[in-house]
Amino acid sequence: MSRYRGPRFKKIRRLGALPGLTSKRPRPGSDLRNQSRSGKRSQYRIRLEEKQKLRFHYGLTERQLLRYVRIAGKAKGSTGQVLLQLLEMRLDNILFRLGMASTIPGARQLVNHRHILVNGRIVDIPSYRCKPRDIITTRGEQRSRALIQNYIDSSPHEELAKHLTFHSSQYKGLVNQIIDSKWIGLKINELLVVEYYSRQT
């Protein structure tokens, strides 16, 4: 299944706010999550919608998300918590959380077009897994810095997650630690996502 490139507002009406996909918010009364034909959502549909919310927020294909779920399932600790940590530590998401891009698709473009360096080296893989003490910067070219500055100027100045530090004058971000679950940038019940996949096997 390919990555979603359709109307974004349609998705947030169905699933609620998806800040990684779009900065838009559903209008009051336009949220379709509780408006099913039967008047009551099944447990399957609730789990499916949580899975879709995670997938569209982080801009993943179905295959990519399934791979992350499998990796998380083999790791120590809560599968749901490990899954969120894996997704949050992706380079495209780190750029988004730093405010260097207004959306995760926008961050992905910056990476694909080789505007981003990690520890002084160009990284053009959006799924690159960042680690504590990684330093995220832009290339020294004027065009690269202009793109980042445009994002910084247009993005709402929200409180930065505690696992990150950003020096806007230097276009430099620092990953301080693995993210704590309370700083996840999405309202999600990750256990329902894990349950969804466990029932598919």
Curated annotation (Swiss-Prot):
It holds the Pfam family Ribosomal_S4. One of its GO terms (cellular component) is chloroplast. Keywords: Chloroplast, Plastid, Ribonucleoprotein, Ribosomal protein, RNA-binding, rRNA-binding. Residues 15-43 are annotated as: Disordered. One of its GO terms (biological process) is ribosomal small subunit biogenesis. InterPro entries: Ribosomal_uS4, Ribosomal_uS4_bac-type, Ribosomal_uS4_CS, Ribosomal_uS4_N, S4_RNA-bd, S4_RNA-bd_sf. Residues 89-150 form the S4 RNA-binding domain. It comes from the Eukaryota. NCBIfam families: PRK05327.1, rpsD_bact. One of the primary rRNA binding proteins, it binds directly to 16S rRNA where it nucleates assembly of the body of the 30S subunit. With S5 and S12 plays an important role in translational accuracy. Belongs to the universal ribosomal protein uS4 family. This is Small ribosomal subunit protein uS4c. It comes from Liriodendron tulipifera. The gene is rps4.
